[in-house]
Amino acid sequence: MRLTALVSGHVQGVGYRLFVQRYARDLGLHGYAENLSDGKVEVIAEGDEDALNRLLHWLRRGPPHARVQAVDTQYSEETGLREFHIY
């Protein structure tokens, strides 16, 4: 399963992508987190449904200095990503 999440709020410049990468790797997920020009962070993660749901919990919480306002999600089929990167 593949999760696409657009995270809005104060999520850039606060270590959000590194936070996401750490939890994604711990959960055995593959994908990436990327800052977007509109101030959002896009997270693409692939793996089993339980791990994706657990990651979604952390996406909504964020690191201490982040202020997550919304997480818009979409699910689709996996595409075979490997590792978890930050862009």
Swiss-Prot record:
Domain of life, source organism: Bacteria
Domain (Acylphosphatase-like) ranges: 2-87
Reaction(s) this enzyme catalyzes, per UniProt: an acyl phosphate + H2O = a carboxylate + phosphate + H(+)
MF GO annotations: acylphosphatase activity
Gene it is expressed from: acyP
Enzyme class: hydrolase
Protein family (similarity comment): Belongs to the acylphosphatase family.
The species this protein was found in: Deinococcus radiodurans (strain ATCC 13939 / DSM 20539 / JCM 16871 / CCUG 27074 / LMG 4051 / NBRC 15346 / NCIMB 9279 / VKM B-1422 / R1)
The name this protein goes by in its record: Acylphosphatase
Active site, UniProt feature: 17, 35
EC annotation from Swiss-Prot or TrEMBL: 3.6.1.7
Keywords: Hydrolase
One Pfam family named in its UniProt record: Acylphosphatase
InterPro entries (alphabetical): Acylphosphatase, Acylphosphatase-like_dom, Acylphosphatase-like_dom_sf
KW Hydrolase (keyword) present: yes
